[in-house]
Design a protein with these regions (language model features):
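Accessory cap/linker subdomain of secreted extracellular hydrolases
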Residues: 89, 152-262
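Proline/glycine-enriched tight loop/beta-turn segments at coil->beta junctions
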Residues: 50-52, 60-68, 132, 263-264
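Short beta-strand element of the alpha/beta-hydrolase
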Residues: 55, 64-74, 548
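Short amphipathic alpha-helix adjacent to the substrate-entry channel of hydrolases
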Residues: 79-95, 287
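C-terminal, loop-rich substrate-recognition/catalytic regions characterized by aromatic stacking residues
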Residues: 218, 317-610
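Short beta-strand/loop motif that positions the catalytic acidic residue
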Residues: 264, 270-272
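N-terminal cap/lid segment of alpha/beta-hydrolase-fold proteins
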Residues: 26-62, 461-463
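Gly/Ser-rich "nucleophile elbow"/oxyanion-hole loop immediately N-terminal to the catalytic nucleophile
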Residues: 60-65, 108-115, 121-142
Length: 610
């Protein structure tokens, strides 16, 4: 700790004064014939007196002021020096800074809540260093993506010239809940980042512990906010967040909210994937930025990538699917091409031919559009019919479709608008294989998992076309309770009977879909129209002879907060709220709207028969 920064006098915070010399004498390190100047024990004092640990790496050959690349993260690792060196290798000053309390910071660890001002203050500090030319770019994914948006909440620092958020977390929107539904994998995350100054990898990596906890919570039926009591290790951050099920001031204070997006006038490059859990966050920021700033220079790159693949170099094989050669791009390389363009005036990356840049799965090509809406030139609308299609399929558990492995029909017009299918979910039954799980573990599969829900299928298509964008529509339902959680998944069923998952399933809580800031309970046994919240987008060539399949289902499983429908705060509900069983009536005027890009000839067999 001898090399830790000694701060200047208390009357002059670092964020307000230009220092005459480096606050920590750089040490010289030679690697691969490159000489680096490294400061790895810097403490930056924020406006409220907290100290932020930072690392700075420069190439000794660069003697004039230079742009800096900032990576501000909660995931403090001893190996982060390499990330700063990578920026230096690209001709920049590499800066790593950590969430308050992390690394060498002596303060308490505070995830999320102070990043807006702390990151701004780090940028201010960078801009006042002798090696800085007052140009800063930021990049990084997941939490680090959120941090970049937080940094511009109260205004864009004059030195900040661009942000490159990947697979961005959006607290209160896309984590720890998605469209109102909490998911259990967030529970151990708080221990991971808050148990020590770096990361509690040992505890976090104990998959058996978290699996056992999920099963114990599910089996005993205790309230969601008692999960840490079952675990035996207090989790105050997890419980604090459960006190805010709506998108209230607690969440709004963390990142830009509504009109605050209007002042974000720097170029933005976002990256995400069709199979990225963080796509909902990326989509939220894109939607809000372009809504409140009509001139937003916001670019998107999206392809068949997972959460980690969309941050760096995607794997060529993901979840049973070999991605197209065209999709096998170096996203890290693209990011630094972008920095060269914005910070050094070089040519814009060739991939960015328009604002929205997307890889069309199965077509081995990239598409480009000025906006999300312009990715498609038509919409397919299908209604969830209660009539059988006659199309049999292989079911994973033989548990849905009222016990028969035959799809119901997706109709282009509702033949019986008053028709319906009824689903009963018994929350008291926690026996094995009663999980109401629908979804998939492999993008391409022989079987379809529908839980106790229902699957619906189109007629086979007579020509190729592209699905481009996010499906919409509305569910027409009635329930015997006041609320429920549900999922909707979209697949291509190929002529050989295989199922291709087009993106991750949509999940939503009915009482929050209309207004995430105010819960609106359903009236029992009254038919209600429920629109969709944020739906992940996709792009894929749908081949001639293929069909589209939609799976709808209520949610009851060991990995997701259980909404018993009593109307009480869901995190407080327990097995005493389980009766009566939830009865969901899915009406046949429910419809799914699917954005497509078609050529002149585009008809399904059903259309030809009209």
């Amino acid at each position: 700790m001898a090399s830790v920064l000694v701060l200047v006098t208390t009357s002059c915070f670092l964020i307000h004064c230009k220092q005459k010399k480096d606050i920590q004498v750089p040490r010289t390190v030679i690697e691969d014939n490159t000489t680096y100047l490294i400061q790895d024990s810097i403490l930056i004092q924020t406006r409220d007196g907290v100290k932020i640990h930072a690392i700075v790496v420069r190439n000794s050959k660069i003697t004039k002021p230079n742009p800096a690349i900032l990576f501000h993260t909660i995931y403090s690792r001893k190996s982060d020096l390499q990330k700063a060196k990578m920026a230096a290798d690209h001709g920049y000053v590499g800066v790593i800074s950590y969430t308050r309390g992390k690394g060498l910071s002596p303060d308490s660890i505070v995830p999320f809540k102070k990043e807006a001002t702390d990151t701004y203050d780090v940028i201010e500090w960078i801009s006042r260093q002798e090696w800085s030319d007052q140009k800063v770019g930021m990049y990084g994914g997941s939490y680090v993506g959120f941090v970049q948006w937080a940094s511009v909440k109260h205004g864009v620092h004059p030195a900040l010239k661009t942000i490159v958020p990947s697979v961005s977390v959006a607290p209160g929107i896309a984590e720890p809940m998605e469209n109102g539904v909490h998911q259990n994998f967030h529970f151990p995350w708080h221990h991971y980042v808050s148990n020590n100054k770096y990361l509690d990898t040992t505890l976090y990596s104990n998959g058996q512990r978290w699996q056992d906890l999920n099963m114990k919570w599910y089996g005993e039926g205790v309230a969601y906010n008692k999960m840490d009591s079952l675990d035996g290790l207090p989790n105050p951050q997890f419980n604090e967040r459960l006190l805010h099920p709506t998108y209230d001031a607690y969440w709004q204070s963390m990142m830009p909210y509504k009109e605050e997006f209007s002042h974000i006038d720097i170029p933005v490059l976002s990256t995400t994937g069709y199979y990225d859990g963080g796509q909902t966050g990326t989509r939220y920021y894109l939607n809000e930025h372009t809504k409140y700033n009509k001139d937003a220079a916001h670019y998107l790159v999206i392809g068949p990538y997972t959460h980690f693949g969309a941050q760096g170099k995607p794997n060529t094989h993901i979840l049973g699917y070999d991605i197209d050669p065209a999709a096998q791009i170096d996203i890290t390389g693209l990011i630094f091409e972008w920095f060269d363009h914005i910070l050094k005036g070089k040519k814009k990356p060739s991939l960015l031919k328009d604002k929205i840049n997307y890889e069309v799965m199965g077509a081995n090509k990239w598409g480009h559009a000025p906006s999300l809406e312009q990715m498609a030139n038509d919409t397919l609308t299908y209604y969830l019919s209660s009539k059988r299609s006659g199309v049999a399929f292989k079911s994973t558990y033989d548990s849905g479709n009222n016990g028969e492995n035959v799809h119901f029909s997706l109709e282009e017009r509702p033949s019986d608008p008053k028709g319906y299918l009824e689903q009963t979910i018994d929350f008291l039954d926690r026996s094995n294989f009663t999980w109401n799980s629908s979804g998939w573990g492999s993008i391409i599969a022989d079987n379809l998992t529908i839980g106790q829900g229902f699957s619906f299928v189109t007629e086979p298509f007579t020509s190729d076309f592209e699905i481009n964008g996010s499906f919409g529509g509305e569910m027409s339902v009635s329930i015997n309770k006041k609320d429920f959680d549900y999922s909707v998944a979209l697949y291509e069923q190929t002529p050989d009977g295989k199922f291709f998952a087009l993106t991750l399933p949509y999940v939503g809580r009915a009482s929050y879909v209309l207004n995430r800031e105010k819960r609106q309970l359903l009236r029992p046994n009254i038919k209600t129209k429920i629109p969709f919240g944020i739906v992940r987008m996709t792009s894929k060539k749908i081949g001639k002879g293929s069909r589209l399949v939609v799976v709808v289902n209520g949610i009851k499983d060991p990995f997701t907060e259980i909404n018993y429908g009593s109307g009480k705060p869901v995190s407080e509900e327990n097995m005493t709220d389980a009766t009566p069983p939830l009865v969901i009536t899915w009406y046949s005027d429910s419809h799914i709207d699917i954005p497509v890009k078609k050529n002149k000839i585009y008809l399904s067999m059903a259309t030809l028969c009209k």
